[in-house]
Amino acid sequence: MKSVEEQLALIQRGADEILVEAELVAKLKRGQPLRIKAGFDPTAPDLHLGHTVLINKLRQFQDLGHQVIFLIGDFTGMIGDPSGKSVTRPPLTREQVLENAETYKSQVFKILDPAKTEVAFNSTWMDQLTPADFIRLASQYTVARMLERDDFSKRYASNQPIAIHEFLYPLVQGYDSVALKADVELGGTDQKFNLLMGRELQRAYGQEAQVILTMPLLEGLDGVKKMSKSLGNYIGIQEAPGVMYSKLVSIPDTLMWRYFELLSFRSLDEIDSFRKDVEAGANPRDIKIKLAEEIVARFHGEEAAASAHKSAGNRLKEGELPEDLPEIELSSPEDMPVASVLNKAGLVKNAAAARDLLGAGSVKVDGQVVDRTFMLALGETRVFQAGKKAFARITLKAE
């Protein structure tokens, strides 16, 4: 096992916050494998790269010799996480949740080592709680404290309904840490309230409080909003190799460093050398190709990654549009100028680059050269080409 200092440096990589870092150091100094928990509610059947930020961190803990618990929230999934929601989420049936859970297990083991992963379902202990147990659990927190949570307070202030079962969600997630005796819990930055609940409940039930580690929410292909299937700015980990490759090489240049930090297993020194290469004049696309090949290989194998790269290169040489064209959805209250479309979709570095390409006659929409007066209308879907290598099928939806 690596030294405490070496472990801490790796654990800190990409992390937004560690609470409390001194407690983590104390736990590491014991020299015993820690129980590392991360929970996922199977509310949809497919995972995307945004989900893998946490799973990658779990793998890092595995490689450091710690015990990883991949918790499938089949019980909490039927409640629906209210984090960041302005309305009550419709609950799923147990059948829907369990069906989605099966696909999760097959997908996560493309990253995690199955031999070193404990897969748990929170219905295992939650279904065993008696009404008296639930009342004891609910007594550990007050309504006033619940309303300190930003999403609840906003809904309360605007007279939007908050269902009682939504108050139960953070309590149940916190109780999961009690049941699993977690030493560390991972979650996105939007989960901080729920993660802190775990610390409080562990103390209330006579356990040592877990350390919480929050990871950033990965931006989607637009480089602005968090990756989400509903926003259309996602890369699914079960997407075809060519589609995944095309999407990754089409991300904005500035976004690739974020993706390297949160998705790549390369060393920080190697990533820093890539950054210096770009600053010295290297083509950013060449660096994005390295990222795309690494991630496609992780989910589909080295051969598929090499084939995706070769196919993309052949199509570009022949001037053909890619068959696996990236699909991007943008939103706006009104029709959008072509320069804004190119910029927001990440087909160019910035608005100035879009204007330069338009002035040079190097922008095509559905195969036809357009100038800066072109507007993408609300509800339309068009194929955009910026220069020789940047392509995307873009849909403009009304906000």
From Swiss-Prot:
GO CC annotation terms, alphabetical: cytosol
Catalytic activity: tRNA(Tyr) + L-tyrosine + ATP = L-tyrosyl-tRNA(Tyr) + AMP + diphosphate + H(+)
EC numbers for this chain: 6.1.1.1
Motif ('HIGH' region): 42-51
Domain of life: Bacteria
PROSITE patterns for this protein: AA_TRNA_LIGASE_I (PS00178), S4 (PS50889)
Domain named S4 RNA-binding: residues: 336-396
InterPro entries: aa-tRNA-synth_I_CS, aa-tRNA-synth_Ic, Rossmann-like_a/b/a_fold, S4_RNA-bd_sf, Tyr-tRNA-ligase, Tyr-tRNA-ligase_bac-type, Tyr-tRNA-ligase_bac_2
One Gene Ontology term of the molecular function aspect: ATP binding
KW Cytoplasm (keyword) present: yes
An annotated GO BP: tRNA aminoacylation
Subcellular location: Cytoplasm
Pfam families noted in UniProt: tRNA-synt_1b (PF00579)
Motif ('KMSKS' region): 226-230
Binding locations of ATP: K229
NCBIfam families: tyrS (TIGR00234)
Record-stated family: Belongs to the class-I aminoacyl-tRNA synthetase family. TyrS type 2 subfamily.
Subunit organization: Homodimer.
PANTHER family on file: TYROSINE--TRNA LIGASE, TYROSYL-TRNA SYNTHETASE
Protein name in UniProt: Tyrosine--tRNA ligase 2
Organism of provenance: Pseudomonas aeruginosa (strain ATCC 15692 / DSM 22644 / CIP 104116 / JCM 14847 / LMG 12228 / 1C / PRS 101 / PAO1)
